[in-house]
């Protein structure tokens, strides 16, 4: 792993509450990723085979609706995590994640991450705490967005 990846990994907002030993354990499974504007990181219903930490660019999280088509729920940027469906069976994307800009970041293989969290309960617990915190923040943001929507 390059020094740039180690530095980016250690400074990412999603991982800042993890202890150094747990971050280093996770670092063994991280790979850089890049995606062009307009491309999808994942699509609703597809196999969720990765977990992504955004370092630059913006990602639109959308849902497919019967009456309105693809509707944006929120936008995520640097310091945010994308993709939690890898954790929950049947391991399929629940939402779409599309790059608004060119996006760069770090990616974990879903199988590797599930296995690593199962083998190291301390890591699994800390990772889940951070993931639940992230989901709670997103739910609050979605609630706020819905309260601002006028039909």
Q: What are the language-model segments listed below?
A:
Residues 1-151:
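Cytosolic regulatory regions built on CNB/CRP/Popeye-like sensor folds
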